[in-house]
Amino acid sequence: MLRAALADSVSDHLIADVPVGVFLSAGLDSTTIAALAAETGTARLRTLTLGFEEFRGGPNDETALAGEVAALYATAHETRWIRGDEFAAARAALLDAMDQPSVDGVNTFFVARAARQAGLKVALSGLGGDELFASYPSFRQVPLLARRLGPLRPLAPLGGVLRALAAPLVAAVTSPKYAGLLEYGTSVPGAYLLRRSLFMPWELAGILPPEMARDGLAELDTLTRLGATLGDVADPRLQVSLLESAWYMRNQLLRDADWAGMAHSLEIRTPLVDIELLRRVAPLLAAGAAAPDKRAMADAPRRKLPGAVLARPKTGFVVPVRDWIAAPGGERGLRGWARQVHAAFGGVA
């Protein structure tokens, strides 16, 4: 059932009267899509990999393994390389295309640009596989945190006091948001917010005008809405899948794919985010411990994926934004990038 559902979704998303390709990394999602697409008999399927000069030859360089996958399935493959100075040159255009602030989409912006330069007008993406097949670290970390701290829930109202006292010490060794462990970590919605947020609610008044932060948080009522997303679902995997799909994938990943693709007049299609696919695999996803994981997805192609792909630990699509935007004395990584994006939209970095 799973193999047929995946194959049908990929086949349906290949239908077009313009050139179509596949974004190919060394991850299970895109390699599975490329393999299934090759099975359809599409004449000389085109695949594209984005490489970063900073990673060339290192553990985060996916180009060689992606090339191995392309050779196995006989695709017309291209690798496009990008450097930090190209990011700097395109930064203004990237932020302009963004429409509204986001910390993601950098990788999609550049791979979409490369695809358009290669003559593609449609590209298939592996977006959605992590949410569907439970492969984010959050699927393990969120239930574990809520389970371990759950007995302390009666003390959660005191979490704000503890957080204020512990914040300077926590900030010295890790992200400041983890000062809120007791305040947020005793429930699944709170643990998810703690795991996924870049900045926690109490930090926003230092980024936005305090009144705006206060009113926005009151209107959003984040924990209540996160809890409402779960409804009466009790299975930990399904709980996290709902949260990741509704809050991270829908609000960030899909929106970022849309603006990043449209910036280059490229349509990005997502075979793993498909209502018919979800209908067909929903009974499998509700099977508890027997629910299919990424390995089951990767077993779908008739011609099996290379062993190096199957054995490769999950790394995500790594972009060297941390190095590209690093500023002396400032926050690094996505928190630093978020402040720069906010400043570009009229805020204060």
Write out the residue ranges for each language-model feature.
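Phosphate/ATP-binding catalytic cores across multiple sugar-kinase/actin-like superfamilies
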Residues: M1-G21, A114-A118, Y248, Q252-D256
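ATP-dependent adenylation/pyrophosphate-handling site
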Residues: P19-G67, A71
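Short beta-strand segments
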Residues: V22-S25, R46-G51, T79-W81, L124-G128, ...
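Short catalytic/ligand-binding loop motif for oxyanion handling, primarily in non-cytosolic enzymes
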Residues: S30-I33, A88, E131-S135, R140, ...
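A conserved beta-strand->alpha-helix junction
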Residues: L45-R46, E62-A97, G105, A118, ...
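Active-site adenylate/phosphate-handling loop in enzymes that bind or generate adenylated species
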Residues: F110-A172, P176, A257-L277
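Adenosyl-5′-phosphate
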Residues: R113, L120-V122, V173-A349
